[in-house]
Amino acid sequence: MYSFNTLRLYLWETIVFFSLAASKEAEAARSAPKPMSPSDFLDKLMGRTSGYDARIRPNFKGPPVNVSCNIFINSFGSIAETTMDYRVNIFLRQQWNDPRLAYNEYPDDSLDLDPSMLDSIWKPDLFFANEKGAHFHEITTDNKLLRISRNGNVLYSIRITLTLACPMDLKNFPMDVQTCIMQLESFGYTMNDLIFEWQEQGAVQVADGLTLPQFILKEEKDLRYCTKHYNTGKFTCIEARFHLERQMGYYLIQMYIPSLLIVILSWISFWINMDAAPARVGLGITTVLTMTTQSSGSRASLPKVSYVKAIDIWMAVCLLFVFSALLEYAAVNFVSRQHKELLRFRRKRRHHKSPMLNLFQEDEAGEGRFNFSAYGMGPACLQAKDGISVKGANNSNTTNPPPAPSKSPEEMRKLFIQRAKKIDKISRIGFPMAFLIFNMFYWIIYKIVRREDVHNQ
């Protein structure tokens, strides 16, 4: 009986003990503070009750804000020589520290916020100095990222498409290497308030497999500082330089090879018979007109610049060779017809000599007429140049050299035709050799010498 009462007492004490412990835990749980919701935390961090003012930069009246920039290139293309600009799609990332946004109340080390929160914080006033046109991307939502870290670091990323100016030097076109720049500058804050700098690692990144239609984007990229001095102060500026080497495959197929074939086609005229005037003239005029059209087409996609380009020299020399081939036939035709002119000249000369000889003979045979022979003057003396007579008492004493035998018209014709054919034979070798020498100098200068000068710059 005694042991039963003792057991009941022990059980009662145990129940009371656990009941009191449970009630204390419940009371402690009710009295513990509730965890802060994300909305309450953001209101406390940057809301109206936080005292945060987005109009005031971090470290106001203190050291300047250092903004680290990084660019990721999604696409690079639409390089236009006529307007001298290029189009690029990038992720622009900016990082800076805002001590007012540091927190300890929230468990996460970083917060990825909605883009609408960007209006609630201070942001750098970055703009692209050489920008000609730009737009944001809003499909399917605003392509913007805002991330705040526990220590107050802010990451702001945005996707934009830019059309940037790119002054080009086209002297070596289409074997040129262009350098296009991208300048990032502060619009309103001077260097006393804001400083841009490139990220130490991977400041400019390029998407894998990025290719350009006519250019090769070189891996080395120059990152520079370009501080701007204006009347309103000294402003921070950084720039990236992209080196673009043109691939001339398109121009080789569309311009160089066709013009080369036209020049070679004009040389066929040297193998056509010189008597086939319609064929040779038609071929010459056709090649000249075709070369002129080809030259005009090469300039259609290029700006009107004051200097001479490599393609201009090529087209001008090709046109010169084609035109020279046409002039060569004019020379051949002229030389081949010279025997007719010479025969016509001889006939005229004989026609003028005959009346004079008849006159002298009549004077010598007629009675009572003055005889020049008595004074040693005959027709030969009268025909002497400048009226000077031959000395001697008697004309018979004067010895005249025998006249050179004149060639027959057929021999003269063959002589001049041989001269014309010789011009054709020389042209068959001379024109290709001259064009080959020009090609050697042209390609050596523009592919080796000029390229080394560009790389040295």
UniProtKB/Swiss-Prot annotation:
Summarizing the annotation, the consequence of altering R100C is: In HKPX1; abolishes expression at the cell membrane; requires much higher glycine levels for channel activation
Q: Cell membrane among the record's keywords?
A: yes
| GO BP term, pick one | visual perception
The stretches that face the Cytoplasmic side, renumbered to this chain, are: 273-277, 331-425
Q: Which reaction does it catalyse?
A: chloride(in) = chloride(out)
Q: Which residues are glycosylated?
A: N66
- What's the effect of swapping L319P? In HKPX1; impairs expression at the cell membrane; requires much higher glycine levels for channel activation
Task: Locate the residues binding Zn(2+).
Answer: E220, D222, H243
Upon changing E220A, the result is: Abolishes potentiation of channel activity by Zn(2+)
Q: Which residues bind glycine 2?
A: T232
- Which segment of the chain is annotated as a signal peptide? 1-28
- In this UniProt entry, which residues are annotated as the site Important for obstruction of the ion pore in the closed conformation? L289
* Extracellular face residues: 29-250, 299-309, 447-457
Which topology term describes how it sits in the membrane? Answer: Multi-pass membrane protein
Reported function: Subunit of heteromeric glycine-gated chloride channels. Plays an important role in the down-regulation of neuronal excitability. Contributes to the generation of inhibitory postsynaptic currents. Channel activity is potentiated by ethanol. Potentiation of channel activity by intoxicating levels of ethanol contribute to the sedative effects of ethanol.
Q: Which NCBIfam families match?
A: LIC
Q: What else is known?
A: The alpha subunit binds strychnine.
Q: What is known of its domains?
A: The channel pore is formed by pentameric assembly of the second transmembrane domain from all five subunits. In the absence of the extracellular domain, the channel is in a constitutively open conformation. Channel opening is effected by an outward rotation of the transmembrane domains that increases the diameter of the pore.
Give the multimer and partner information: Interacts with GLRB to form heteropentameric channels; this is probably the predominant form in vivo. Heteropentamer composed of four GLRA1 subunits and one GLRB subunit. Heteropentamer composed of two GLRA1 and three GLRB. Heteropentamer composed of three GLRA1 and two GLRB. Homopentamer (in vitro). Both homopentamers and heteropentamers form functional ion channels, but their characteristics are subtly different.
This protein is called what?
Glycine receptor subunit alpha-1
Task: Provide the organism lineage as a comma list.
Answer: Eukaryota, Metazoa, Chordata, Craniata, Vertebrata
Gene field: GLRA1
